[in-house]
């Protein structure tokens, strides 16, 4: 797929992406690499200059209506999607739009708000919430219809450590409960490590690497060349002479403890 803007700028330059049903794919790349443009094509918001897009068995743009009924999305700027007077109305909005009776939609919205631990926000205006609260409300609206495909565009951008950790935990749990396919974009290698079953690295609108998180995210040279920051524990272990450092932080800790133990035994 290729997408060129009217001035000739190539935002996506021959990029190919295949996602299996039920898979969690993280598209990893620096700002300006084409991640959001790619998602806009999957959502039918843009039409490619060249190439073909097929989502959930439907060719776009012809099947865009059917596709959108089966997709949940959290945009990078969630203010663009939180449009109703209250949180409860916002979460119920997509359900009502899909034809669910209003009372049933509000009941389902309350269930998902409670599931995410934000039921106390249901009467609050979304525009007055914190950044982390807004992301959770947007996530509630995205998963309330139990989508086949969940799309998350830079979902932890601007969140502090605690909010990021909560968001990641909830995504993992919801994925397990609902079984949706997931495509997530980010520049944060740690988020990719936490949520990806497969990682696709893009730079300047092109795929530069694809594979398991263990293979991709521990390749320090690849990550740096792609304009990204490698996981700190991976960098540390590489400096200590470990050629193939583990991606899992617990395994890294065990390895460091073992190395320190060997060093202490060798230096009584």
UniProtKB/Swiss-Prot annotation:
EC number: 7.-.-.-
SMART domains (UniProt xref): AAA (SM00382)
Recorded GO CC terms: ATP-binding cassette (ABC) transporter complex
Transmembrane spans: none
Translocase recorded as keyword: yes
Enzyme class per UniProt: translocase
Pfam families: ABC_tran (PF00005)
Molecular-function annotations in GO: ATP binding; ATP hydrolysis activity; ATPase-coupled transmembrane transporter activity
Annotated residues for binding of ATP: 29-36
Subcellular location(s) per record: Cell membrane
Topology with respect to the bilayer: Peripheral membrane protein
Record keyword Ribonucleoprotein present: no
Record domain ABC transporter: where: 1-229
Keyword set, alphabetical order: ATP-binding, Cell membrane, Membrane, Nucleotide-binding, Translocase, Transport
InterPro entries: AAA+_ATPase, ABC_transporter-like_ATP-bd, ABC_transporter-like_CS, ABC_transpr_CbiO/EcfA_su, ECF_ABC_transporter_ATP-bd, P-loop_NTPase
Main function: Probably part of an ABC transporter complex. Responsible for energy coupling to the transport system.
Family designation: Belongs to the ABC transporter superfamily.
Protein name per UniProt: Putative ABC transporter ATP-binding protein MK0182
Native organism: Methanopyrus kandleri (strain AV19 / DSM 6324 / JCM 9639 / NBRC 100938)
């Amino acid at each position: 797929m290729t997408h060129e803007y009217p001035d000739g700028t190539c935002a996506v330059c021959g990029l190919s992406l295949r996602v299996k049903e039920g898979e969690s794919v993280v598209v990893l790349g620096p700002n300006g690499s084409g991640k959001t443009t790619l998602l806009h094509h999957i959502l039918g918001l843009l039409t490619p200059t060249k190439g073909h897009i097929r989502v959930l068995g439907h060719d776009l743009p012809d099947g865009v209506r059917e596709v959108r009924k089966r997709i949940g999305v959290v945009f990078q700027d969630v203010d663009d999607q939180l449009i109703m007077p209250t949180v409860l109305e916002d979460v119920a909005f997509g359900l009502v739009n899909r034809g669910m009776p209003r009372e049933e939609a509000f009941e389902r919205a309350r269930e998902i708000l409670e599931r995410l631990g934000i039921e106390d926000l249901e009467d609050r205006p979304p525009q007055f919430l914190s950044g982390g609260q807004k992301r959770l409300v947007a996530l509630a609206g995205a998963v309330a219809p139990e989508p086949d495909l969940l799309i998350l565009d830079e979902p932890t951008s601007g969140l502090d450590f605690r909010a990021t950790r909560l968001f990641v935990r909830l995504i993992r749990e919801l994925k397990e409960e609902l079984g949706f396919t997931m495509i997530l974009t980010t520049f944060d290698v740690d988020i990719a490590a936490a949520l990806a079953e497969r990682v696709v690295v893009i730079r300047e609108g092109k795929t530069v690497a694809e594979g398991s998180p263990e293979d991709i995210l521990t390749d320090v040279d690849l990550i740096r060349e792609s304009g990204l920051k490698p996981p700190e524990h991976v960098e540390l272990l590489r400096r200590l002479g470990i050629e193939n450092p583990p991606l899992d932080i617990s395994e890294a800790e065990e390895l460091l403890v073992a190395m320190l133990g060997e060093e202490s035994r060798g230096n009584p």
